[in-house]
Structure formats: structure tokens, C-alpha cells
From Swiss-Prot:
Catalyzes the radical-mediated synthesis of 5-amino-5-(4-hydroxybenzyl)-6-(D-ribitylimino)-5,6-dihydrouracil from 5-amino-6-(D-ribitylamino)uracil and L-tyrosine. This is 5-amino-6-(D-ribitylamino)uracil--L-tyrosine 4-hydroxyphenyl transferase. It comes from Microcystis aeruginosa (strain NIES-843 / IAM M-2473). Residues 59-306 form the Radical SAM core domain. One of its GO terms (molecular function) is iron ion binding. Belongs to the radical SAM superfamily. CofH family.
């Protein structure tokens, strides 16, 4: 294949994207499979152009705290170094007082958001009810800190509660919302292709269930985020299938005028350093490959940007320097201060667990772009 025969389709695709049109899945795959550095530079420039057009030059961040309330989990995802059995060394399960104390510390430090998720612990019940356990945490947090935005419980956790108690997803989500949950994290998405999920997270909900729960949340008025775990066994085609499903889910929310939608897309590159050996050995790397992550970051902006405008890198996984570079590849948000983080750190990530507002603002300023604190839903 000649150089010009490779260049022509890529430039045509990028011109189409710049015109404001949505790309097809096939066109996105062509971009991801591009290896010519000159063309990759054009992909970056197009993503940066669209980012500027769709969200402006301001880079946002949120002052938040992660609270991972337990790592006791019934599942055994092949990428996860966080989960433990109840009697295993390193297992933890925070009580209500400890959770409230962490939230109080976060509020003292200026946090507007608590992001809360945990392992799937069948013993986390009150009088035999899983939902009641989660509701007790939420009600006590909101009673103590009514103005705090509670971004809590992934679609996987919603399904777990529903299964344990024999409830519908709608009942679980509505109950959490009524108790004070303000939005759901779009984690546990990993790759929304069941062929991949059967290898990396066979016990997790399938792609259709993840999408159903997210759609139900939107219909009930709860915003969600969206994520993708990349850089392991998935192919470019499977990456695009994932993006396509997220875009379609957002289009459903927009076309039906649901009261809520997907607020952001976050790319989460696989960190293998301390991950279980089978997947770590199969992937053959301990830390993310920055160049691959940046190219996918750009293609995600180009493919999703018309419907999901806010794109965020993971500084925990890429480090602050890598995440700052992603702001040149289509991202417009640098995420949160976190204050603590266990899931990725236990997998061996080198990005750290806490950044100050000053550190985030300095990183943004290094690009000569203005910084602005935001709330959870932008």
C-alpha cells in the first residue's frame, strides 16, 4: 500500500470530523490503526480543534475525595489487585463512623464531591437487606453534609443490590436517589464487548446490563459518567464498539429528552504492575503505554465529542505529566483532587493518590490555558 493511499482516507475522515459530522465505526477504526507519526499528529490536531470548538480552552477540575469503603468482593476480575476475601490479609471494610470522618475531612479541605464505591460484599446488609446497608451510608452522609454531591455506586453495585434483594434496577436507583445519591459513576464498564468481558471480568454484568442500568438512571434523573478500561487484550475494533455503545446510549438520553445524561468520558488505561499474573503476563506490560493512550484519547474525542463534550484523563494511571499531555489530545478536564485512591494504586500505578488544587492549576497553566473549578455535573 502506498503512502498516499494510507494518507487519503485518514485526511478525508479528519476533514469529515472537523465539519461536525459523526464518524462511522469503520472510520474510527482506521484512525486507531494508523501508525504513521505524521498522520497521528493530524489526529491529535483534529481532536484538539474539536475540543476547543466543543468546550473552549478552559480546563476544569473538581475538589473531591474518593472513599473506597471496602475491598471485600465476591468477584475475581482478572485486572483487579484491589479485591480481597473477607479473611485475607489486606482486606478492609470501613464502618459508618470512618466513612463520615473521611467525608468531614474532605469538606474541611474544600471538597464539593464524594466519589464512593466498594467491593461486592454479600455480608454488607442490615437485617438481611443489601439496599438498606447502602441507604444507611447515604442518609447519614447527606444528613451530616447536605450540600455535598454524592457520586456513588457503579452499575455493577446497582445490579449486585438488586440481585441480593430481588429488586428491579429502577427500584434500587430510585431508592438511592431519594436517599441522597446525586449521580452514578460509570465504572465497571471496562470494555462493553462481552467477548472481552468473558476474559477479563467473567463474573461482572454484561454490556447490555451496564447500558440498561445507565439508561434507567438517566430516565430517573440521575446523571452518570462513562469510562473505558483500555490497553490490555482489546482490539481497536472492540475499542470502537465500546465507544459506539456509549455514544448510542447518550443519543437515547438526548433524543428522548431524559432529565439526565452522561456528563463525561474517562479513559482508564490498564495498570498491570500488581494485577493478577495471568492477565499481567498476557498483556506483557506493567504501566500504560502513553502513546497508545493518547491516540485513543484523541479518537474518543473525535468519535464522542458531539454528544459527550467533557473528556478526562486519569492522572492516577498516567501520572500528572501524562494526564497534562492528554489535554493536548482532546481532553478538557483534569479530574479531581481525590485525596485518596486505593483501586489503581493497589494495581501498581505510579500517579499517586492525591493532588492539591495548586498542583492541578500549575499543570493546566503550563499549557497557557485557564483553569476553573467545577462541580460534578459541569
Amino acid at each position: 500500500m502506498t503512502n498516499s493511499s494510507i494518507t487519503a482516507p485518514v485526511t478525508d475522515i479528519l476533514a469529515k470530523a472537523r465539519s461536525g459530522a459523526n464518524l462511522s465505526a469503520k472510520e474510527a477504526i482506521i484512525l486507531l490503526e494508523t501508525t504513521d507519526n505524521r498522520l497521528i499528529a493530524w489526529i491529535r490536531e483534529t481532536a484538539d480543534f474539536l475540543r476547543r470548538q466543543q468546550t473552549g480552552d478552559t480546563v476544569t477540575y473538581v475538589i473531591n475525595r474518593n472513599i473506597n469503603f471496602s475491598n471485600i468482593c465476591e468477584q475475581h476480575c482478572s485486572f483487579c489487585a484491589f479485591r480481597r476475601d473477607e479473611d485475607e490479609e489486606g482486606a478492609f471494610w470501613l464502618n459508618l463512623e470512618e466513612i463520615i470522618a473521611k467525608a468531614a475531612d474532605a469538606v474541611r479541605r474544600g471538597a464539593t464531591e464524594i466519589c464512593m464505591q466498594g467491593g461486592l460484599n454479600p455480608k454488607a446488609k442490615i437485617k438481611g437487606n443489601s439496599l438498606d446497608y447502602y441507604l444507611e451510608i447515604v442518609k447519614n452522609l447527606k444528613q451530616a453534609f447536605p450540600d455535598l454531591h454524592l457520586h456513588a455506586f457503579s452499575p455493577q453495585e446497582v445490579q449486585f443490590i438488586a440481585r441480593e434483594d430481588g429488586l428491579s434496577y429502577e427500584k434500587v436507583i430510585a431508592s438511592l436517589q431519594e436517599a441522597g445519591v446525586n449521580s452514578l459513576p460509570g465504572t465497571a464498564a471496562e470494555v462493553l464487548v462481552d467477548e472481552v468481558r468473558r476474559v477479563i471480568c467473567p463474573e461482572k454484568i454484561d454490556a447490555a446490563t451496564w447500558l440498561e442500568i445507565v439508561g434507567t438512571a438517566h430516565r430517573l434523573g440521575l446523571h452518570t459518567t462513562s469510562t473505558m478500561l483500555c490497553g490490555h487484550i482489546e482490539t481497536p475494533s472492540q475499542q470502537v464498539q465500546h465507544l459506539e455503545k456509549i455514544r448510542k446510549q447518550q443519543e437515547i438520553a438526548l433524543e428522548n429528552n431524559y432529565p439526565a445524561k452522561i456528563t463525561e468520558f474517562i479513559l482508564l488505561p490498564f495498570v498491570g504492575q500488581s494485577a493478577p499474573k495471568p492477565l499481567r503476563n498476557r498483556v506483557g506490560q506493567d504501566q500504560p503505554i502513553l502513546a497508545d493512550t493518547l491516540k485513543l484519547t484523541a479518537v474518543a474525542r473525535i468519535y464522542l465529542g458531539n454528544s459527550i463534550k467533557n473528556h478526562q484523563p486519569s492522572w492516577v494511571k498516567l501520572g500528572l505529566q501524562g494526564a497534562t499531555e492528554a489535554l493536548n489530545w482532546g481532553c478538557n478536564d483534569l479530574g479531581g483532587t481525590l485525596m485518596e485512591e486505593h483501586i489503581t494504586t493497589m494495581a501498581g500505578a505510579l500517579g499517586g493518590t492525591c493532588l492539591t488544587v495548586e498542583e492541578l492549576a500549575t499543570a493546566i497553566k503550563s499549557l497557557d490555558r485557564p483553569a476553573r473549578q467545577r462541580d460534578t455535573i459541569y
